Regions:
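Sec-dependent N-terminal signal peptides
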Residues: 4-15
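Glycan-recognition patch characteristic of GH18 chitinases/ENGases
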Residues: 20-109
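Short, acidic/polar
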Residues: 29-43, 98-115, 177-189, 313-327
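Solvent-exposed loop/turn segments at secondary-structure junctions
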Residues: 30-33, 54-58, 87-91, 128-132, ...
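Conserved, mostly hydrophobic/aromatic
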Residues: 49, 124, 196, 237, ...
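Aromatic-lined substrate-binding rim segments of carbohydrate-active enzymes
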Residues: 57-86, 129-158, 217, 344
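Substrate-binding surface in catalytic domains of secreted glycosidases
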Residues: 130-278
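Glycan-binding loop/region signatures in secreted carbohydrate-active enzymes
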Residues: 243-324, 346, 354
Length: 354
């Protein structure tokens, strides 16, 4: 009985420790000055730093390297660093996935660089993948994870959300499943990697009509779908920090498929925008900040050149609702793209790293 009681205390203590450290705050960082400055200012709030430092081509050649100042500060603060390795396009990744020799070269380079630089591990950020490469992506991920684990390193992967697990009816839904969402076998990937970062953002982009970067129901649906296949302790919820600004772009000259004549065509555009720039735009053109209660997101519209333009962005309230969702679902953490675009108020919500 005494031993059972002792084991029970150990289990309770372990659960309490996990609760104290979750959700782990994973932040992405690019090499832009704004992104690096944000990291330098808020490093104590970050649980894992994921910088965009590496890429791989069709031959398995890994290129890139760390920002020395960023890496030095992270190491001084004992902040885990897990850089991204990104693919060089759909065709290059397809070739890599079919070439065992190239994969071995990539894996050896990742292990070597991780040990040399003192990284926690590496994150795969492979996007724009054909759904027909689903199995080979899972296989390469397993090979890489096995090699990393053998050296005491970790492998994570960023995945495009893919609920409900099949293509929709419309042409756009079919295209985005074939070329973006369908390549990720969450169950197979979860068996190999240490963490899956669910990229629950870019619901609406330049490819779509104006709308939230990550609407509430869409976010919840994709999170719950992922939880069917991924253990909670291996799942991180994507929370965007940025927004989009939709406007009427300059008409473009293209050949009409029917007449074969060059004609002007519409060019509705959507530009990536930081929260700071969004608020500046609203002030300049007298936009009134709105709150969409259904989608838990901030937005406004302005008039410029007599045309209505739309902005959906992430303010502190938008971030907080999704942060609380990660807490309520008791998942490992959240992953936010990207430092330098955030509302400064989010940092008041986050505890210091333990």
């Amino acid at each position: 009985m005494k031993r059972i009681f002792q084991l029970l205390l150990v289990v309770i203590a372990t659960v309490c420790m996990q609760a104290e450290t979750r959700p782990v705050a994973l932040f992405y960082m690019t090499d832009t000055p704004d992104s690096v400055r944000s990291f330098l200012a808020h490093s104590s709030k970050i649980g894992i730093l994921v910088p965009t430092w590496y890429s791989v081509d069709a031959t398995g050649l890994v290129t890139g390297g760390p920002n020395p100042a960023v890496l030095e500060l992270a190491q001084k603060q004992h902040l885990p660093v897990m850089p991204i390795i990104a693919n060089a396009g759909k065709d290059a990744l397809h070739t890599l996935l079919a070439n065992g020799t190239a994969q071995k070269a990539m894996i050896a380079a990742l292990v070597r660089e991780s040990k040399l630089q003192g990284y926690m591990g590496i994150q795969f950020d492979f996007e724009d993948i054909s759904w027909t490469d689903r199995d080979t992506l899972s296989a390469m991920t397993k090979l890489t994870a096995d090699a990393m684990h053998a050296e005491g390193l970790q492998l994570s992967i960023a995945t495009v959300p893919n609920a409900p697990g099949y293509a929709g009816k419309g042409g756009f839904a079919k295209w985005i499943y074939e070329d973006w969402r369908g390549a990720y076998d969450l169950q197979a990937l979860a068996q190999s990697v240490d963490l899956i970062c669910l990229m629950t953002y870019d619901q609406h982009t330049r490819w779509t009509p104006p709308g939230p970067v990550a609407g509430w129901d869409w976010t919840v649906e994709n999170l719950d779908y992922a939880l069917k296949f991924v253990p909670k302790e291996k799942l991180s919820l994507g929370i965007p920090l940025y927004g989009y600004h939709w406007f009427a772009g300059s008409p473009v000259m293209r050949e009409d498929p029917a007449t074969k004549k060059l004609e002007y065509h519409p060019n509705i555009s959507a530009n990536y925008i930081s929260t700071e720039d969004a608020l500046l735009l609203a002030r300049e053109y007298k936009g009134v900040a709105q709150w969409d209660a259904a989608d838990h997101t901030a937005w406004f519209f302005i008039y410029r050149d007599q045309m209505r333009e739309w902005v959906f962005y992430t303010n502190t309230r938008t971030f907080e609702d999704r942060y609380k969702l990660a807490q309520e679902r008791a998942i490992e953490g959240f992953c936010s793209w990207v430092l330098g675009t955030e509302d400064s108020g989010i940092w008041e919500l986050l505890p210091d790293r333990k």
